[in-house]
């Protein structure tokens, strides 16, 4: 089997965009998940940190976007503002390098809602953010949930805990039954898997990648201290 992004069914523009980031071959979790997501199946994916889970769902989301339709086609839910920001920036990088005018917006409680409402007027196709803020904006009819084709639960084990699962279920219920649900995490408990399965279609697939991550050994990490109000300007 040929282990290339082209063989997984991705358009040339996305493959070129990945090359711009120095990514030339799919990881194990990407090889397993991308075809299933492209086929429309609900998916539970497990793979360790640094294994490429974010691109495992972003790439098929971009591949499936209908650019003739303006409005939210994919919602990516995360348990933390920091993870939401990371996913958003990867989505922005992907659309810039691929030349695909997807339209992405970051919706988190740490940022002013006024600016977010302004960005939603442009009818972005990909929405990334915290469960509470996205649910609030759906209820305010600022997000057209009936257009949503894919919902991603990133770090899904945490989104299935008692503090999040009701809001996650509420977001899902606002969308059409034909929508796709994708859950990813480094590990998924039996309880979390059961909760997720109750929200998914009967033919959902459960995938696991056991190979190591792609974070280079010896990499140096840096951080900058800043005031809370400055983190998501």
Predicted segments, located by residue:
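Conserved nucleic-acid-binding Ia/Ib motif block in the N-terminal RecA-like helicase ATPase lobe
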Residues: 16, 20, 70-139, 147-150, ...
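Short hydrophobic/aromatic beta-strand immediately N-terminal to the Walker A/P-loop
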Residues: 44-46, 75, 182
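Post-DEXD/H (motif II) to motif III coupling segment of the RecA-like Helicase ATP-binding lobe
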Residues: 144-212
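Walker A/P-loop NTP-binding motif
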Residues: 31-43, 54-69, 89-95, 135
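Conserved interdomain hinge at the start of the Helicase C-terminal
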Residues: 218-233
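Conserved catalytic network of the ASCE P-loop NTPase/AAA+ motor domain
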Residues: 36, 66-70, 96-100, 118-122, ...
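The conserved Walker
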Residues: 47-51
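Conserved pre-motif I regulatory segment
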Residues: 1-46
């Amino acid at each position: 089997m040929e282990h290339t992004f082209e063989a997984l069914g991705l358009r040339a523009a996305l493959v070129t965009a990945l090359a711009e980031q120095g990514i030339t071959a799919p990881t194990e979790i990407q090889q397993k998940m991308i075809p299933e997501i492209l086929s429309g199946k609900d998916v539970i994916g497990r793979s360790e940190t640094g294994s490429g889970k974010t691109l495992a769902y972003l790439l098929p989301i971009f591949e499936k976007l209908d650019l003739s339709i303006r409005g939210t086609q994919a919602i990516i839910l995360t348990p933390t503002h920091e993870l939401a920001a990371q996913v958003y920036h990867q989505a922005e990088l992907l659309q810039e390098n691929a030349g695909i005018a997807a339209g992405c917006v970051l919706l988190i409680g740490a940022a002013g809602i006024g600016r977010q409402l302004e960005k939603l007027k442009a009818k972005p196709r990909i929405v990334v953010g915290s469960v509470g803020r996205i649910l609030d904006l759906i209820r305010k009819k600022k997000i057209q949930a009936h257009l949503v084709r894919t919902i991603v639960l990133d770090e899904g084990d945490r989104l299935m805990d008692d503090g999040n699962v009701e809001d996650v279920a509420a977001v899902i219920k606002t969308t059409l039954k034909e929508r796709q649900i994708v859950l990813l995490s480094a590990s998924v408990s039996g309880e979390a898997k059961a909760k997720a399965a109750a929200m998914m279609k009967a033919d959902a697939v459960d995938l696991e990648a056991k190979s190591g991550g792609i974070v280079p050994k010896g990499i140096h990490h840096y951080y900058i201290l800043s005031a809370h109000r400055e983190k998501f300007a």
